[in-house]
From Swiss-Prot:
Family statement: Belongs to the peptidase S1 family. Elastase subfamily.
A GO molecular function held by the record: serine-type peptidase activity
Enzyme class: hydrolase
Designated name of the protein: Elastase
Species annotation: Gadus morhua (Atlantic cod)
Transmembrane listed as a keyword: no
Keyword Heme: no
Keyword annotations: Hydrolase, Protease, Serine protease
Biological process according to GO: proteolysis
């Protein structure tokens, strides 16, 4: 979840999906 928060702070939606 934390990783998703960081990614969502400076990444695109599709990149966030890859993070999860």
């Amino acid at each position: 979840v934390v990783g998703g928060e960081v990614a969502r702070a400076h990444s695109w939606p599709w990149q966030i999906s890859l993070q999860y």
